[in-house]
Amino acid sequence: MASTNQKVVIIDTGCANVSSVRFAIERLGYTVTISKETSVVLNADKLFLPGVGTASEAMKNLQERDLVELVKQVDKPLLGICLGMQLLGALSEEQGQNGKELVPCLHLCDAPIKKLKTGNLPLPHMGWNTITPIDNHPLFQGIPAGSYFYFVHSYAMPVSTGVNDYTIAQCEYGQPFSAAIQSGNYYGVQFHPERSSKAGSQLIKNFLEM
């Protein structure tokens, strides 16, 4: 079990409401720092990368705050949440209102970010849904099968197959998509664990105790 004295940092991207993530971590007994300073980020034991809005706006924010290369230098466990998970991918279809080209993201995970094809189901995918994690992954330890998590999104990473197997949990909403990923020390969840009741709290606890 990791110590609650470890350095926990939420990266200050300028494109996220970090309060709910901070409170969820503090409820578990940890002290949280919100920062974009190089020394603070690189000395952290665990990091969170939250995000809201569009991929194009978020990447612009990261560039303006000199965070793109900094995030790539992180060698400790980092958890991207919602848009923060998508930013870990390669190219996003979510360009914003005036964009026509794919948005280059951090490319820490070799995955595209595509608009969900939901048939008659409405977009965004908003509300509670179940996920199917891979067996015995530590991020989902102690979380009962069939647990619900809270989603708000219109874009997602496909479920991975083959050599670049990044999917560690999947969800179904008109089509299967990656609900959680791992690429080395970078983790991501498409749902909001900080808004997902006991299951979400357990997931955050698991991440902090890795």
Curated annotation (Swiss-Prot):
Catalytic activities: 5-[(5-phospho-1-deoxy-D-ribulos-1-ylimino)methylamino]-1-(5-phospho-beta-D-ribosyl)imidazole-4-carboxamide + L-glutamine = D-erythro-1-(imidazol-4-yl)glycerol 3-phosphate + 5-amino-1-(5-phospho-beta-D-ribosyl)imidazole-4-carboxamide + L-glutamate + H(+); L-glutamine + H2O = L-glutamate + NH4(+)
Listed pathway(s): Amino-acid biosynthesis; L-histidine biosynthesis; L-histidine from 5-phospho-alpha-D-ribose 1-diphosphate: step 5/9
Keywords, comma-separated and alphabetical: Amino-acid biosynthesis, Cytoplasm, Glutamine amidotransferase, Histidine biosynthesis, Hydrolase, Lyase
Matches recorded under SUPFAM superfamilies: Class I glutamine amidotransferase-like
A GO term for molecular function: glutaminase activity
Keyword rRNA-binding part of the UniProt annotation: no
Originating organism: Photobacterium profundum (strain SS9)
Compartmental location: Cytoplasm
Protein's gene: hisH
GO biological process, one term: L-histidine biosynthetic process
GO CC field: cytoplasm
Superkingdom of the organism of origin: Bacteria
Domain Glutamine amidotransferase type-1 intervals: 7-210
HAMAP family associated with the record: HisH
A Pfam family recorded for this sequence: GATase
Stored CDD domains: GATase1_IGP_Synthase (cd01748)
Name this protein carries in UniProt: Imidazole glycerol phosphate synthase subunit HisH
